[in-house]
């Protein structure tokens, strides 16, 4: 019997990244939402929103709420669009599926996944896992030795939340996964309130404000200094940007606006010389302009200080340090040396540099800090899944078939994919051995092997602490490594 094609769906709360394994090396990306325009009185499903000419007052209906898929009626409509000839043109009955699910997915929601996929869409087989479980297969942590690290920290920065996920030997250590209630949605809403209070009323302009946040936002490396800089005159200020809002007129093709002046301003060829981006030039007095000063970095700062808006949670650096402190002492050096960033929010400018700097104050002097950033963190789960599904053993090992489901029900999926809170996924990237508890003591022979490979730092060495930064191309999909070296010698 011929092996069916494998459809990969990274089913995020904000966007879907999907494609056929071995065919679509880059995913098709479409919004995971149904949008309704108040002016055009039309409904747009998924990528159809690209045809909307007036994004003012767009109302969204999303399948996800607080990070969980709770509206399968809406999700089914979006997936139907995804499978249609206009997008992927696939027949589910002739296809195997790999789909990502939320961290700590509730059992009743997980069962609904099984029912919809096998009973509604009738896929031949499918496998379900959290995004971080796929990352060991990708090239994010790839080294010159070609040996994947056995202990890593994955920071998944998504639409609803940010998760800090420890992974050992290809398995998520579920009892130590931590969540910060700061994601892309919160940052967009925070920016909406700042702009509406200080400048224009944009409470109903979610789509436009989200574009403003993505274009202008950055993580401050000097919070107090940047605040003082923003007080200078706008025309001579190195931080303040002029962001021209879209007018949604018939002659305008700029749907989300553009940066007219300041850092990252649109170049003249993109603005037709001095006017609107690819649109009809307007007199400056007719344009609605946002002055983006401290609004650029006030939102991303919440990742490091959630308490600024009343969240009783520690920031991202402290959460990472706490998670690593719960690991066996013999392995903490490897966790510190392999911290990876994935998810759409990982694209924020200066994130890796700020995280590295803040972690230096929390990391013991004998360990190294390694921050790994993908060039496209939003698509890393998808590209990692392509590597997994390309393996010879994938089809015979991971998916549950439709026949097996109707014979044993969702109980088989629970056993094979893992249940709520369990160390669930038997994913064994090359070089890993699964089934080892992260709390197991490490033998002397294994530690000596790790020292020899440079995967672990010895404690008690003498030497002055020094800092060294380097960036190298890592992996098939362009990971970037920034490393800070601890002790100068043993």
From Swiss-Prot:
Protein name, per record: Actin-like protein ARP6
UniProt keyword annotation of Nucleotidyltransferase present: no
UniProt source species: Cryptococcus neoformans var. neoformans serotype D (strain JEC21 / ATCC MYA-565)
InterPro entries: Actin (IPR004000), ATPase_NBD (IPR043129)
Record GO terms (molecular function): nucleosome binding
GO biological process: chromatin remodeling
GO cellular component terms, A-Z: cytoplasm; cytoskeleton; Swr1 complex
Pfam families named among the record's database cross-references: Actin
Family of this protein: Belongs to the actin family. ARP6 subfamily.
Family annotation (SMART domains): ACTIN (SM00268)
């Amino acid at each position: 019997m011929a092996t069916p094609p494998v459809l990969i769906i990274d089913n995020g709360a904000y966007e879907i990244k999907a494609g056929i394994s071995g065919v679509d090396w880059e995913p098709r990306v479409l919004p995971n939402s149904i949008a309704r325009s108040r002016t055009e009185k039309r409904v747009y499903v998924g990528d159809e929103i690209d045809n909307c000419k007036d994004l003012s007052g767009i109302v969204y209906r999303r399948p996800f709420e607080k990070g969980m898929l709770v509206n399968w009626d809406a999700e089914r409509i979006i997936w139907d669009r995804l499978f249609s000839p206009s997008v992927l043109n696939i027949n589910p009955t002739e296809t195997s599926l790999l789909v990502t699910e939320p961290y700590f997915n509730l059992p009743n929601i997980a069962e609904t996944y099984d029912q919809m996929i096998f009973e509604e869409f009738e896929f031949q087989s499918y496998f379900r896992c959290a995004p971080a479980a796929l990352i060991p297969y990708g090239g994010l942590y790839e080294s010159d030795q070609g040996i994947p690290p056995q202990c890593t920290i994955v920071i998944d920065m998504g639409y609803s939340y940010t998760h800090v996920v420890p992974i050992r030997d290809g398995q998520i250590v579920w009892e130590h996964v931590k969540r910060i209630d700061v994601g892309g949605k919160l940052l967009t809403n925070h920016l909406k309130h700042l702009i509406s209070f200080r400048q224009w009323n944009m409470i109903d302009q979610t789509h436009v404000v989200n574009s403003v946040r993505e274009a202008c936002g950055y993580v401050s490396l000097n919070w107090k200094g940047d605040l003082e800089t923003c007080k200078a005159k706008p025309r001579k200020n190195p931080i303040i940007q002029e962001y021209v809002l879209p007018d949604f007129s018939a002659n305008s093709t700029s749907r989300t606006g553009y940066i007219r002046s300041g850092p990252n301003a649109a170049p003249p060829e993109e603005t037709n010389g001095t006017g609107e981006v690819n649109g009809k030039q307007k007199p400056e007095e007719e344009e609605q302009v946002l002055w983006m000063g401290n609004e650029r970095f006030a939102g991303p700062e919440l990742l490091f200080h959630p308490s600024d808006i009343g969240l009783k949670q520690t920031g991202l650096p402290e959460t990472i340090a706490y998670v690593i402190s719960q690991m066996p002492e013999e392995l903490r050096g490897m966790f510190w040396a392999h911290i990876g960033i994935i998810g759409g929010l990982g694209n924020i400018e200066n994130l890796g540099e700020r995280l590295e700097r803040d972690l230096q104050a929390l990391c013991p002097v004998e360990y190294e800090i390694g921050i790994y950033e993908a060039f496209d963190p939003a698509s890393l789960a998808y590209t990692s899944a392509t590597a997994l599904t390309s393996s010879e053993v994938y089809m015979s090992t991971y998916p549950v078939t439709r026949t097996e489901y109707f014979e044993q029900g969702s109980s088989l999926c629970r056993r094979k994919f893992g249940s709520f809170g369990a160390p669930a996924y038997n994913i064994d990237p090359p070089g890993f051995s699964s089934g080892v508890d992260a709390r197991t003591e490490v033998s002397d022979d294994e530690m000596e092997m790790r020292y020899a490979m440079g995967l672990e730092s010895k404690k008690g060495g003498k030497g002055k602490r020094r800092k060294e930064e380097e960036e190298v191309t890592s992996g098939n999909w362009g990971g970037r490594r920034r490393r800070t070296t601890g002790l100068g010698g043993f």
